[in-house]
C-alpha cells in the first residue's frame, strides 16, 4: 500500500476507473451477445434494434479508450455482416 498521500489518492482513483471500465466493457460484450443470439433466432426486427445498441456501445467504448477505434470498427463491420445475412434470407 502507498504511503504518500497523492499515491494513495491515485490508487483509489485507479481502482474506481478499473471498476467502471470493466463495467462498460461487460455491458458492451453483453450487447454483442444479445445481438448474436437474435441473429441465431433469425429475428430481423429485434436484431436490427440490438445492432444499433451494440454499435452505440462499441462507439462509446472506442471514444473512451476502452478499445481501439479500429477494433470497434472491425466488430461493427462483422455484426453488420451478420445482420445483412439474415435480412437477405
Swiss-Prot record:
Pfam families given in the database record: Ribosomal_S20p
Domain of life: Bacteria
GO CC list: cytosol; small ribosomal subunit
MF GO annotations: small ribosomal subunit rRNA binding; structural constituent of ribosome
Keywords of the record: Ribonucleoprotein, Ribosomal protein, RNA-binding, rRNA-binding
Biased composition (Basic residues): 7-20
Gene Ontology biological-process entries: translation
InterPro entries: Ribosomal_bS20 (IPR002583), Ribosomal_bS20_sf (IPR036510)
Region of interest: Disordered: 1-25, 69-89
PANTHER family, alphabetized: 30S RIBOSOMAL PROTEIN S20, SMALL RIBOSOMAL SUBUNIT PROTEIN BS20C
Family indicated by similarity: Belongs to the bacterial ribosomal protein bS20 family.
HAMAP family from the UniProt entry: Ribosomal_bS20
Function: Binds directly to 16S ribosomal RNA.
Protein name according to UniProt: Small ribosomal subunit protein bS20
Organism: Geobacillus kaustophilus (strain HTA426)
Lineage: Bacteria, Bacillati, Bacillota, Bacilli, Bacillales
Name of the coding gene: rpsT
Amino acid at each position: 500500500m502507498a504511503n504518500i498521500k497523492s499515491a494513495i489518492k491515485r490508487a483509489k482513483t485507479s481502482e474506481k476507473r478499473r471498476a467502471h471500465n470493466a463495467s462498460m466493457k461487460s455491458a458492451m460484450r453483453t450487447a454483442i451477445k444479445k445481438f448474436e443470439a437474435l441473429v441465431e433466432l433469425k429475428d430481423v426486427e429485434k436484431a436490427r434494434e440490438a445492432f444499433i445498441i451494440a454499435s452505440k456501445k462499441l462507439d462509446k467504448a472506442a471514444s473512451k479508450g476502452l478499445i481501439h477505434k479500429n477494433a470497434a470498427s472491425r466488430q461493427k463491420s462483422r455484426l453488420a455482416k451478420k445482420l445483412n445475412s439474415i435480412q437477405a434470407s
